[in-house]
């Protein structure tokens, strides 16, 4: 597990133990809304600038492209920040049927949007110079660490409510400052000169389709939380969140291998090394199974003890953990099939899979959550991921 995941897990654990189910649920709902707004607000410019700068040879053209992406991202971030603030009351009261506290949390979390969008665009810009360390330092170490530390300070020196409101904004602002310094060091681009950036139509044209792909993935990730908030209450969301975060540990194994596996598979595909591709595919699945199985077994055999980490009031959410652990294990083992499709010339097929998964998951949540609550959301996730795994087995077999 990377440092960032450790810090995020500690954040969830301590917030659950100190703030309780209700406040954790409110934080989860506001976070889900903000993450979905963020992926729309980025306009796909993070991935777009990675491609454009990587292919550009002239340094000045690289700088102009980065300034253009930052300017468009900044404007978009401000626009979607205002939209989220304006919709905060409607979302909290009419969609989630919650108190004014959720309105406040959604509105204040919106202030982080321009900063997080700049962070992502800047981080991918540094990656385009074939330097991954700066992106990792800010997005995977500093941001989650500041989030954790700010939450602890807010809780002990202010209030439990401030611990779910302020840390997100502090983390975003400090992360933006740090990545801006790194970006200037590597590319010579000063973020204070962003007003000089020009509108790059080609960059935006390439980036927007990526945005829609990202939206599908983000919606699939947050559907359970959003729909639990719609059909139930923040306490149910608060019980569900730690179980989902814990089961997510299993998926980290998939992400770790996918980063190495993807480029290798793409290279073999270009060289038409079919037998080597088949061997690599089976080898990676074997390794993913080996490393993820112990986590899955632990969560399936000792779910009550695992949930006690978050406090006694989370104990009765252990069946949710068991179902989500099974779902995460299936995704970890068969998820590499999605990477295979992308790297072997079938990205549209993978996009179709994600679209089907979103539709299926939303439909199942509509049907199961009203009668089963958190278990309904977990069951919907299990069925969806099992279905996609089955589809990928067939597709990769061909």
Q: Where on the chain are the PLM-derived regions?
A:
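Signature of the first transmembrane helix
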Residues: 1-47, 76-85, 112, 147, ...
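Helix-loop junctions and terminal segments of transmembrane helices
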Residues: 12-13, 42-57, 128, 243, ...
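Interfacial/gating helices of multi-pass transporter permease domains
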Residues: 14-35, 103-104, 166, 199-206, ...
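Membrane-interface helix-loop junctions in multi-pass transport and translocation proteins
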Residues: 16-26, 129-133, 145-177, 181, ...
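Interfacial segments at transmembrane-helix termini and the short loops linking adjacent helices
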Residues: 88-109, 234, 282, 299-329
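Interhelical loop/hinge segments that connect adjacent transmembrane helices in multipass membrane
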Residues: 101, 161-167, 178-221, 260, ...
